[in-house]
């Protein structure tokens, strides 16, 4: 049996190809430097070990060559990439409290309907931050813990586990862009 492959060029991006203005957003300077990495870590009030991991990951990123697999990235100018953009809102646990412009983005992508229909919980990331987090009662009653990574990092119960496990499945030494992730990650669950 032959399997059909969907080529990246064949994907209709029109659903996802839209932008909003950046009013009300906090944005760091472009580039991937030790100062930017330190600023991300400071904004998140991370423990020293996380800053150390970020800086070590940046060293690995700068040392590794660009990959030769996949599409050409010759035109990729890392000095023009902004790695941290924070919407002007705190994390919400009630969908109705999420600002309308952010809510409209997720509505357009179908996220709220997917949550209501299929998921036990969802965390919605908008640019660099988790802006919405909700766990259905049935999952939490079963003892399932679902948290944003930054929230867990500040919880004395979970921080040691994150310290032990963070980036062990795909370590920064795996490849250049795993190292980039280790240096400038933000948000997630």
Q: What are the residue ranges of the model-derived segments?
A:
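Glycine-rich and polybasic anion-binding loops at the starts of cofactor/ligand-binding domains
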Residues: 2-189
